[in-house]
Swiss-Prot record:
InterPro entries: Ankyrin_rpt (IPR002110), Ankyrin_rpt-contain_sf (IPR036770), Palmitoyltrfase_DHHC (IPR001594)
Name of the protein: Palmitoyltransferase akr1
Transmembrane segments: 315-335, 337-357, 373-393, 402-422, 499-519, 549-569
Entries under Gene3D superfamilies matching the protein: Ankyrin repeat-containing domain (1.25.40.20)
Length: 738
């Protein structure tokens, strides 16, 4: 919160209406005397309401002697004078028990908080209508750097306010996952309850925070805990109606038939809260019918469709049949009938795959998230190989031996690099071995003012190296993340980027060679004795009917040549820039938003010209650089055309072209801190000592002629480090860019 904006004190009851455990009603009010019923209206369930009219009492006290106002705006100089003149102490309390530390904490005045603590302020003093500690005030504004400072100085995280909420409950209600990560590493019991038996998981489920629900469940929270009214987290999630929360709870084994004290099951709650549609969909996504029972499929298919290994193989091999069926129908039937029959057959086979996906494990419910697309390529590659071995090779080897040898070499190379790119670890950032190690990492990031979404992953619980990104498909952070490619069903990162580039280059060359070979092959074949075509002329008809299957297959792979060429061009340009696809699409930048002049101004605002005392980094970065920035969980809707544009890499191609043709001086363009010039960038990529055929050391690569490890790169190389710092591009999520 800006120091120039009047702050507010948490009010004791304004945010408590809505969550209750009365056995006679669906949860309604927390801490209220007579719990109201939850209606279908938007019942705001907040613990503390911060009204803008609440601020430290002003009266006629001059600003220079108003200790509360001085604490609020963070003026250390005047505060020091008050202490020197013995007018106040750091433990001064007003008539409500509020201390200067409360006001400094809620206004994110890090330097003032540290100053007060160093002067003996009681870190656990309770005050205000809510009888809360400074740490609680800070937690309700998600000022987790302040919370960390107070915890370091002895703040007790298990203290409760007048309504029985501790700091974990307050942090959960505001939904900040980073604050929860900090608190859970303070040995706070994950299932600690409030006065009415609500756990943090219940609050997260009620508020509809999927990231917080996931965090609590991964931390070991009891998914079937019950409060004083007998409600479980699943009941609370259905009150809010958040599909991701409900689905996550069911996946973790929530009791689908648990009843409250007044006999209400989750289904009953869903009906009363008008969230039945969410309830049914979550059940379906997790493999249950509308009654909550496990779906039973005919012919014993249930066990097969629920088996991830079996379904992975099915989705990969099914397109082999689809490609063959489409090519066969188009090549063996009259064109008027072939096209509609081929479309019906193709969509029919795809419908089977989609129905199988609807009963598969939850991560396979969307066809694009399965190995289906990689199977399309593998099937095409397989039938090209079969056609070449049994048709093209015998007819052309004697007349075109060199061309055949070249094609065979590039076909084998394409297959090898494809399989390697698909099966190799793309560069997953190693996870820490224990929670104690996680805590050490978190403390180190706090010391460096880097505990934020750009430097720490709340899913993997690891420090994110530069150029890394968390892949939702792989559920891991990937070093030097390029993109998640559905055509290889794997991420492309530090370990397999070169193999991926070699794969598409060999594919490009292989397609061109095969087209030349099949042209020579068709010319060698004798023309059919009798032939009749409905559309094309007689001469072309005779040419096509010599081997229609091979020609249709040629047409299919020629279409693939278009997007493969664009993909090759994009990757080669990015290699010359030492840039990944993700960086290309989201922008490489040095963060110059906090130059030295702003650092100085911030230090003055904090009441000191010392960067250290003001809680600023050497580059002027404040102690809370990204805390006010919210994170949207609302996914973008993409049309069919845009989805295929992403899948085929067309959007990346045009983005690269626009960047190359952009007007304006180069000095105005975002700087790439990893570029060493075109020649050096290309040499680093292609002359990397890692083997072309075999695994490389995880995370290693060359940068400026030196071996670096992207698994452990947390600082920009000094050669490019000036007055700014590198800022990773972890804002949007183009998971399907190729």
């Amino acid at each position: 919160m800006s120091s120039g904006t009047p702050s507010t004190e948490p009010e004791s009851s304004g945010r408590s209406a809505g969550m209750s455990t009365s056995p006679t009603s669906i949860p309604a009010g927390k801490g209220t005397t007579t719990p109201p019923k939850v209606t279908q209206q938007d019942v705001s369930v907040e613990l503390k309401n911060m009204r803008p009219d609440r601020s430290p009492p002003k009266g006629s006290i001059p600003l220079g002697e108003d200790i509360m106002q001085i604490a609020r705006i963070g003026e250390i100089g005047p505060m020091q004078r008050l202490f020197d003149e013995k007018k106040f102490t750091a433990n001064y309390q007003d008539e409500e028990g509020i201390t200067p530390l409360h006001w400094a904490a809620i206004n994110n005045q890090y330097a003032m908080c540290k100053f007060l603590l160093d002067n003996g302020a009681d870190v656990n003093a309770k005050g205000g209508d809510s009888v809360a500690t400074p740490a609680m005030w800070a937690a309700q504004r998600c000022h987790y750097y302040i919370v960390h400072l107070l915890l370091q100085h002895g703040a007790d995280p298990l203290l409760t306010d007048v309504q029985g909420y501790n700091i974990l409950h307050l942090a959960t209600i505001d939904g900040n996952a980073f604050l929860l990560v900090l608190l859970l590493h303070q040995e706070i019991p994950v299932d600690v309850i409030d006065q009415q038996g609500h756990t943090g998981l219940m609050w997260a489920a009620y508020k509809g925070y999927p990231a917080c629900v996931d965090l609590f469940l991964r931390w070991g929270a009891n998914v079937n805990a019950v409060d004083d009214g007998g409600l479980t987290p699943l009941h609370w999630a259905l009150v809010k109606g958040s599909l991701p929360c409900v689905q996550k709870l069911i996946e973790y084994g929530a009791d689908r038939f648990a009843k409250t004290r007044d006999g209400k099951s989750p289904a009953t709650v869903a009906g009363e809260m008008n969230t039945t549609r969410v309830w049914y969909r979550a059940l379906d996504e997790c493999g249950y019918d509308v009654d909550g029972n496990t779906k039973v499929l005919p012919m014993g298919l249930t066990s097969w469709l629920r088996n991830k290994s079996v379904m992975s193989k099915f989705f990969f091999l099914w397109p082999f049949l689809m490609v063959y069926a489409a090519v066969y129908i188009l090549s063996h039937m009259v064109i008027y009938a072939a096209i509609p029959i081929m479309l019906v057959a193709t969509f029919g086979l795809q419908w089977v795959a989609q129905k199988a996906a609807s009963q598969a494990p939850s991560e396979y419910r969307v066809l694009q998230k399965t190995p289906y697309l990689s199977g399309v390529f593998a099937g095409s590659l397989f039938w090209v190989g079969v056609t070449y071995i049994f048709s093209v090779l015998p007819a052309t080897y004697s007349t075109s031996p060199i061309l055949n040898i070249l094609f065979a070499v590039f076909y084998c190379l394409t297959t090898y690099f494809y399989i390697y790119s698909m099966t190799e670890d793309p560069g997953f950032v190693p996870k820490t071995g224990s929670r104690n190690q996680q805590k050490v990492v978190i403390n180190e990031l706090f010391e460096q003012w880097k505990f934020d979404e750009e430097n720490f992953c709340v899913f993997c619980m690891v420090r994110k190296p530069l150029r890394s990104k968390h892949c939702k498909r792989c559920s891991r952070c990937v070093a030097k993340h390029d993109h998640h490619c559905p055509w290889i069903d794997n991420c492309v990162g530090a370990n397999n980027l070169r193999h991926f580039v070699l794969y598409i280059i060999c594919l490009e060359i292989g397609i061109i060679l095969f087209l030349q070979l099949t042209y020579r092959y068709i010319n060698i074949l004798p023309a059919p004795v009798e032939h009749a075509c409905n559309i094309i002329n007689e001469e072309l008809c005779g040419f096509v009917l010599r081997d229609p299957f091979t020609l249709v297959l040629d047409l299919w792979i020629a279409i693939q040549l278009v997007w493969v060429t664009m993909l090759c061009a994009v990757q080669l340009v990015q290699i010359s820039r030492n840039q990944t696809t993700y960086e290309n699409m989201r922008g490489h930048s040095i963060d110059r938003s906090y130059p030295s002049s702003r650092a100085f101004a911030s230090a003055i605002t904090a009441g000191t010209t010392s960067l250290e005392a003001a809680g600023l980094s050497a580059t002027g970065q404040g102690p809370n650089p990204a805390l006010a920035r919210g994170h949207s969980h609302r996914g973008r809707r993409h049309g069919c055309l845009q989805q295929w544009s992403s899948l085929l890499g067309i959007d990346t191609f045009f983005a690269t072209a626009r960047d190359g043709l952009r007007d304006g001086p180069r000095a105005d363009r975002p700087k790439n801190p990893f570029s060493r010039g075109i020649i050096t960038n290309c040499r680093d990529f292609w002359c990397d000592p890692a083997p072309y055929f075999g695994k490389r050391e995880p995370g290693t690569a060359m940068l400026g002629g030196e071996i670096v490890n992207y698994n452990q790169m947390y600082e920009v190389p000094m050669r490019m480090y000036s007055d700014g710092r590198y800022q990773s591009v972890a804002h949007d999520d183009p998971e399907q860019h190729v």
